[in-house]
Amino acid sequence: MKISKNLMMRIGLCAVILVALPMTIGCAGGTKTIGISQVVTHPALDATRAGIIAGLADNGYVDGDNLMVDYQNSEGDPSLFASIAQQFVTNGVDIIVTIATPNSQAAVAAAEGTDIPVIFTAVTDPVGAGIVSNWESHEDENVTGVSDMIVVSDDVELITEIMPGVKKLGTIYNAGESNSVFLVEKLNEACDALGIEVVEATVSTSADVATAAQSLVGQVDAIWIGTDNTVVTGLEALIGVCEDYHIPLFAADEDSIVRGSIAAYSFDYYDIGYQTGEIVAEILGGKDASKTAVEKGKVISLSVNTAAAQRMGITIPDSIIDRAETVYTE
């Protein structure tokens, strides 16, 4: 059962939008075509895609009406990142929309020298990943989007509130994902400041996640995972190990809390997608992507899963439950 303090607020807001929204914004100029490239299937990225489509629709671009969406999913296969992007370029789509870091990098490379904008989303560190040169002014680059950069130190402080005695914190990530390398660097910085040792385990595919989790058994007091697409895809295997050995598992996105991690300060990835859809609509309407600043997710909230905590052998303090935006109880 999900108990959400802002559920009724969202329902009310949606009702207002449906009544007040002018539906003529995207009607001029005939049918537009966008290519959506998603790096892999997992709930957070699926929610992002749904948010994109909704954000476009609410701004006048309706899939199947005045908008054609070519959706492609590489399912984590790096060999497909570039070929999907190149196919979009060959087909002459109006915009390429990319969900996650590796395929965003491929799309930027494929679209270079063309007039096709690339709008990325769910990318943690777009500057470090080479997708844009900076957050604000990137007029030589026909690229913009929405970052899901989180404050890792907030998650570490949350872990110490729930587990005051934590001394060793494990993390699992794919070293081939630049977003994950960035987050692990931030994790080490945050833990160093609090005297916590970070124990790292790396994976190449989601099939490696269970083995990596097993390698941390007996070595750490808890595990934290960032928004690593490889690990999140194999999350159930990690949760299974953590439940079997009573290793508390913390995450960085709400969908991982829904699936059975304990707590996170995170974005709602549907909202990240919706925010991206609004930007895509603006670019379709004539705004210049190269003059559009990269945005960050607008709302970070605390989500906890009390049942997951019990299965992993700990109890979340009432003070944390009371301030959580969303509490999952099963």
Predicted regions: what they are:
Residues 12-24:
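Bacterial N-terminal signal peptides
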